[in-house]
Amino acid sequence: MLELIKAIFLGIVEGITEWLPISSTGHMILVEEFINMNLSDEFMEMFRVVIQLGAIMAVVVLYWNKLFPFSFEDRIQIKKDTFSLWIKVLAATLPAALIGVPFDDKIDELFYNYITVAITLIVYGVLFIIMENRNKSKIPAISTFEELGYKAVLLIGAFQVLALIPGTSRSGATILGAIMIGCSREIAAEFSFYLAIPVMFGASLLKLVKFGFAFSQTELIILLTGMIVAFAVSIFAIKFLMGYIKRNDFKAFGYYRIILGLIVVLYFLAVR
């Protein structure tokens, strides 16, 4: 029962931090210091990634009308726009797939530690503040997906590669990259959500294959619980973020990242 409660809490953390540009990994590292689940290291490594499937389903549910191209009710142009969007999403996914698949274990081995997480939290926090100050009086050059060209898409994909380093935040890196090349905040955030679908499905499948699908009944219940909670919380987190950025910029998230990065450093220096 206690492990189930811990899984629920981790699902809440995942559902919030996966979509806000504040690094789910950074929060997981901190949370796991206080919530130590009585399960194997191999299962927990897989759990951290596969729990994201629940979060991803929230995007699919919320944006189904934009993502599903086979509705009989949609006009031809709408279907063409949907196919075009998917081609752009897949193109932006290529850089992360080419680097992430062969080097996944090596990246975790080298960078999954509190020092890396703290540095990336702070650095990207500063970059968000600088970017928003720079763009304060600028009108976005890209405010629709039709205006989002393939060069811009590949550049956003290159930023997503940076998110392979723990603490960066996948949504943070892609949103930052998209805004830097001229996207509006809404387009940047929404495209970041769509990019997560192939990337996180792929990462989850990779971890499941490595784990071997060999779950005990307890492990399966814990994994499904975490995924369901992550799905429910993600619905609210995504709606919150899209509503928030219509009226505000990303600077608050930048300051939050800096504060969290300092907390990570101070905490681990104190206990290690």
Swiss-Prot record:
It holds the Pfam family BacA. Disulfide bonds: none annotated. GO terms for molecular function: undecaprenyl-diphosphatase activity. Keywords: Antibiotic resistance, Cell membrane, Cell shape, Cell wall biogenesis/degradation, Hydrolase, Membrane, Peptidoglycan synthesis, Transmembrane, Transmembrane helix. One of its GO terms (cellular component) is plasma membrane. The chain crosses the membrane at residues 2-22, 50-70, 83-103, 110-130, 148-168, 195-215, 220-240, 250-270. Its EC number is 3.6.1.27. Its main location: membrane. InterPro entries: UppP (IPR003824). It comes from the Bacteria. It is a multi-pass membrane protein. One of its GO terms (biological process) is regulation of cell shape. It is found in: Cell membrane. It is an enzyme of class 3 (hydrolase). Catalyzes the dephosphorylation of undecaprenyl diphosphate (UPP). Confers resistance to bacitracin. Belongs to the UppP family. This is Undecaprenyl-diphosphatase. The gene is uppP.
